[in-house]
């Protein structure tokens, strides 16, 4: 939906540096399946950060806010595809690892918030995308059959979670996901962007 994965490539290290600390691992990989709150706990336990979980989450969000407000864009073809889905009576919602206020604001700025009945965030659900809870909550909101409810994901681990739970899946290319071959192999459909004509056949 949003071309925003680039933000999370280095934010873990950048936040530590803002506190005068250096990471001793690839935090992108470490944090891949964690919620922001879980990542904050990790900072506290493994890097001796004395701030509260809320203070850490607020600090990370403050660092990404400006990027979301100015640089994050829609993935190619998504605006037209959402309009087509809406015209054809397809219900849609969002399931995201990003905090609600950032997603709400960005979708409004990009003119697509009205397409979605609801936004579900990992923070509010209480589980990351390594668990299927967020997809199950979204399914409940949509009121559709699981077999007819497609999960679009550009992260391999998240798509694997949805597929393992029985959802049909669409893998979406993202240059920041290094496991493209695995994503393509695992997904029921795989697209480079949202201009792919196969989307109107699903």
Predicted region positions:
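N-terminal helical cap/lid subdomain that shapes the substrate entry/recognition surface
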Residues: 1-88, 101
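Structural motif
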Residues: 30, 95-97, 152
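Non-catalytic, surface-exposed connector residues within folded enzymatic/regulatory domains
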Residues: 54, 72-75, 97, 110, ...
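Asp-based, Mg2+/Mn2+-dependent phosphohydrolase catalytic module
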Residues: 83, 99-100, 104-202
């Amino acid at each position: 939906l949003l071309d925003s994965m680039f933000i999370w490539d280095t934010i873990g290290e950048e936040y530590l540096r803002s506190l005068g600390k250096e990471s001793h691992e690839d935090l992108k990989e470490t944090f891949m399946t964690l919620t922001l709150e879980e990542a904050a706990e990790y900072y506290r336990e493994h890097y001796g950060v004395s701030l509260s979980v809320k203070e850490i989450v607020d600090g990370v969000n403050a660092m990404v806010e400006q990027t979301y407000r100015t640089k994050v864009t829609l993935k190619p073809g998504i605006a037209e595809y959402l309009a087509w889905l809406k015209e054809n009576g397809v219900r849609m919602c969002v399931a995201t690892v990003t905090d609600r206020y950032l997603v709400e604001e960005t979708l409004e700025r990009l003119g697509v918030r009205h397409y979605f009945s609801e936004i579900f965030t990992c923070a509010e659900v209480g589980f990351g995308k390594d668990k299927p809870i967020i997809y199950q909550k979204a399914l409940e909101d949509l009121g559709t059959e699981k077999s007819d409810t497609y999960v679009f994901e550009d992260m391999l681990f998240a798509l694997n979670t949805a597929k393992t739970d029985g959802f049909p899946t669409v893998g979406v290319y993202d240059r920041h996901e290094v496991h493209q071959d695995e994503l393509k192999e695992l997904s029921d459909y795989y697209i480079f962007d949202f201009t792919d004509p196969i989307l109107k056949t699903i």
